[in-house]
Each structure stands twice: as structure tokens, then as C-alpha cells.
């Protein structure tokens, strides 16, 4: 099964990165993308050229389109998100906003993208509703989300050591093994 994993955290070796590595290690054909490793521009500083022709986007050559291709061509995608102020981090919103250009004038791409099963793992000690709302745009179905609270496992999220707890690893593994 082709699996695409995107970690949206800006911390290269934090909890989200560790979760992504765990998923990759337990999957047969998986690719892990660390969003913060790429220069992906937010929308703006343009004349909305993409609305007429997506290849005219001034940022067309950055990694965004390759990420969207990877998701669209996968059998399963995992989004791994940190909770910043009760919402997904800015990297996730950049990814979501920039997707408009990718799909502009190509409804078949949007349909293929939305059909890919997606699962999200959110590292959060607080709000869940905002994540469910934000993730609802990614799929036809209701978001399949695992919320991992560092507090539940006796950890402090900022330390990035959540995956050192065997119960946290067990919960992620069980989430992965759920039928689609």
C-alpha cells in the first residue's frame, strides 16, 4: 500500500517527526515528508494568475505540487499536526490554501485527492473541534483523527519525547492498523 506521510510541525525532531518515522517504519511502501524542510510559499504577492492557468502561479515550482501529487497518488495519507493555540499550525494552513491552485480547473484532481483515505494524528493537550473542522476539507468522509495528549502519557509536549512512551507507540500502531 502506497502511504504518504506529511508532518506539518516546524520542529525537525519533535513529536510529529517521531510519529512520522514510526508510521514509515511500520508501513511497507511509505514516503515521509517533513513540511518544514521545504520552501513552500503562502499565497500572495501575485495577481491570482493561477485562477486562469495554474502553471502561472509564481510559486508553481516549489514543493507544494509534489506533495499534493504524492497525496493524490497514494493509497493512504497521514497528516501529523501539532496543536498551536488550539488550531493546526500555520504550515497546515499554507498547504491547504495553496491547494486551490493545484485543483484550479482540474476537478478530476480534486476528486482523486478527496477519495484518498486520510488519517490525522494531532499532538494536542487541548481543543479537538477546531482540528476536526480544519481537516474536514481534506476528504469526502469525516476526518479519522487520533488525538495524542502528552499529558495522558506523563510527558511534556515541548520535549519531543512522546514516542518514548510504549503506550503512545501502542496507540499510534493501533490507529494505523484500523481497517480503512
Question: Residue spans of the language-model regions?
Answer:
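N-terminal beta1-alpha1-beta2 submodule of the flavodoxin-like/Rossmannoid cofactor-binding fold
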Residues: 1-101, 162-180
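A short, structured active-site edge motif that brings together acidic residues
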Residues: 35-39, 113, 149-151
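Glycine-rich phosphate/pyrophosphate-binding loop and the adjoining helix
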Residues: 138-180
Amino acid at each position: 500500500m502506497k502511504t504518504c506521510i506529511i508532518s506539518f510541525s516546524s520542529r525537525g525532531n519533535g513529536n510529529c517527526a517521531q510519529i512520522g518515522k514510526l508510521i514509515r517504519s511500520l508501513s511497507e511502501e511509505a514516503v515521509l515528508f517533513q513540511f518544514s524542510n521545504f520552501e513552500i510559499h503562502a499565497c500572495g504577492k501575485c495577481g491570482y494568475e493561477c485562477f486562469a492557468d495554474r502553471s502561472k502561479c509564481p510559486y508553481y515550482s516549489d514543493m507544494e505540487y509534489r506533495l499534493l501529487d504524492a497525496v493524490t497518488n497514494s493509497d493512504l495519507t497521514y497528516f501529523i499536526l501539532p496543536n498551536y493555540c488550539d488550531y493546526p499550525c500555520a504550515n497546515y494552513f499554507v498547504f491547504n490554501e495553496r491547494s486551490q491552485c493545484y485543483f484550479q480547473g482540474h476537478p478530476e484532481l480534486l476528486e482523486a485527492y478527496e477519495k484518498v483515505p486520510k488519517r490525522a494524528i494531532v499532538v494536542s493537550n487541548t481543543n479537538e473541534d477546531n482540528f476536526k473542522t480544519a481537516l474536514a476539507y481534506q476528504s469526502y468522509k469525516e476526518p479519522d483523527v487520533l488525538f495524542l495528549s502528552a499529558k495522558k502519557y506523563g510527558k511534556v509536549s515541548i520535549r519531543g519525547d512522546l514516542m518514548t512512551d510504549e503506550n503512545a507507540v501502542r496507540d499510534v500502531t493501533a490507529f494505523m492498523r484500523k481497517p480503512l
